[in-house]
Amino acid sequence: MELHEIAHARAKAWIEEMVALCAPDTVYVCDGSKKEYDTIMQKMVDAGLATPLKKRKNCFLFRSQPSDVARVEARTFIASKREDDAGPTNHWTDPAELKKTMTGLYSQCMKGRTMYVIPFSMGPVGSPISKNGIEITDSEYVVCNMHIMTRVGTRVLEALGTDGEFVPCLHSVGKPLGPGVTDAGQWPCADMERKYISHFPEERLVWSFGSGYGGNALLGKKCFALRIASVLARDEGWLAEHMLILKITNPAGKTKYIGAAFPSACGKTNLAMMIPTLPGWKVETVGDDIAWMKFGKDGRLYAINPEAGFFGVAPGTSDFSNKNAMDSIKENAIFTNCGLTEDGDVWWEGIGYPAKGTIIDWHGVSRPAPTRDKSPKGEEIAHPNARFTAPARQCPAIASNWEDPEGVPIDAFLFGGRRPSTVPLVHQARDWNHGVFLGSIIGSEVTAAVISDQVGQIRRDPFAMLPFCGYHMADYFSHWIKLGSQARAENLPKIFCVNWFRKDAEGNFLWPGYGDNSRVLAWIFDRCDGVDNAVETAIGWMPKEGALNTEGLNVSTQAVKELLSVDIAGWKKEIKDIRENHYPKFGARLPQQLRDALEVLEARINGSEGAACTRDMC
């Protein structure tokens, strides 16, 4: 399709305006075909940017610049009209000033390059929960990744018609080329101080400049699907969440759907693709990262995965930790900043086996292959944030209804962080507002391996949305409370807090995790059916003695008791930290319901309310 053939007048006018600003050599409107993908990928191979992998069919390896390896939160802006609306957790800048600065950067930024126009749908095309966008980019890497991560092409333009709503997303690597000049194998990006990932919430607009990395450049992902979509969800009465969606079926053939929000490094993708150790139980994947949810006609929350692929962290992914992910990336995948073995395969730390002979690291330097699947810190073969991009349909565990345009009905929400102490293996909120409270306080404890002067402190990441909420986080809490108040309690998902990362006094994990997390999911499954397998404690409902299936589990009775106990001293410290360090950040906009929940927790912990007490729980 040619630009002049686009029937949507507003989209066409915007694209033409961006062509005049960015001055590309040519303009190409993406049709979403396999031929298009193959042609553009070959262009990158010819330019020395992509390396075909001999061991994997239709797979390619890319290496970025060391300055362009991850999301850059310090260069990520929420440019709301009022600073207060961005809130304390976002970087705000004046939208008029930001546009002026970025317009200067965009001026002729695509000289020597092709401007690609990518019509894309977040979610199945035509779904009542889906939204459309158009990304303009000068990066072939972005085009090919968007082919995998979203639904791209002519069918999206057809769905838009002549006046459909869309989110405009402008992206440039910020590296124009002179006559006859190519990238010559060098990943194109701008210097750090010229990188901008900017969101204009009231305009539903994303502008990104200077980075080619996934989260900064694949604008359908965090920029649209979370930061802009969270604003849309607030205004339209739905939820856009940093959540996996899994389908779980018990031995009797009954199915439920669970949404789970965890901060980074807490095993979200592993849980979404889990292979249960409990006989007869089955877990299937609907999504591993983002969930969009709207209330259905029956009053229940229905969720879609707005993405079409997985953009996963490679290091640590192995047949042991996530076999389904490993099977998903055997073909038709893109790898970024991984090692390259001498026989033409990718490799990373934690892959489960050593490489042989020599290996090329993510810097492009040839080195002796490690004798184990580990490397000293700072000498990694693969960057710690090395990534794979793969179509979701290739996952062996993908649910047959993962693309149902009506979504799947959510029965439970899980919140959790990486907490070596205090927070038990699982507990259930007493009601919706208590669940919102639990979501608002999740986080991970800083360990000695991270930042030494903060050891023991809790790095809070409410709802795992800290880097992704497009407006004031306190208003986000209020939005959750409001949605709960508008629904019948029996229609709302039950809310649970989980913690796979409790440790004993010697620093050893008490819980094996991975497939054995199915034991916790089985208890949650039964709780959603109202099974009487819980006891009320000071912090919420917890498994009765013997309610958690530990058959065949190599965990001592004492460890299980510790995992399912309420640490009174730990919770008193937790309450103090929330009251003094966490909640004050949100000021007067913090919902009173959350202040009340904290008071109730303190009263229960102090024993002033007669919570039922068993097994040293309270």
Curated annotation (Swiss-Prot):
It is found in: Cytoplasm. Its cofactor is Mn(2+). Mn(2+) binds at residues 222, 242, 289. Its main location: cytoplasm. The keyword Nucleotide-binding applies. Binds 1 Mn(2+) ion per subunit. GTP binds at residues 265-270, 387, 418, 514-517. It is an enzyme of class 4 (lyase). InterPro entries: PEP_carboxykin_GTP_CS, PEP_carboxykinase_C, PEP_carboxykinase_GTP, PEP_carboxykinase_GTP_C, PEP_carboxykinase_GTP_N, PEP_carboxykinase_N. GO terms for biological process: cellular response to glucose stimulus; gluconeogenesis; glycerol biosynthetic process from pyruvate; oxaloacetate metabolic process; propionate catabolic process; response to lipid; response to starvation. It catalyses: oxaloacetate + GTP = phosphoenolpyruvate + GDP + CO2. The active site is at 266. One of its GO terms (cellular component) is cytosol. Pathway: Carbohydrate biosynthesis; gluconeogenesis. GO terms for molecular function: GTP binding; manganese ion binding; phosphoenolpyruvate carboxykinase (GTP) activity. Substrate binds at residues 71, 213-215, 264, 385-387. Keywords: Cytoplasm, Decarboxylase, Gluconeogenesis, GTP-binding, Lyase, Manganese, Metal-binding, Nucleotide-binding. The keyword Lipoprotein does not apply. Catalyzes the conversion of oxaloacetate (OAA) to phosphoenolpyruvate (PEP). Monomer. Belongs to the phosphoenolpyruvate carboxykinase [GTP] family. This is Phosphoenolpyruvate carboxykinase [GTP].
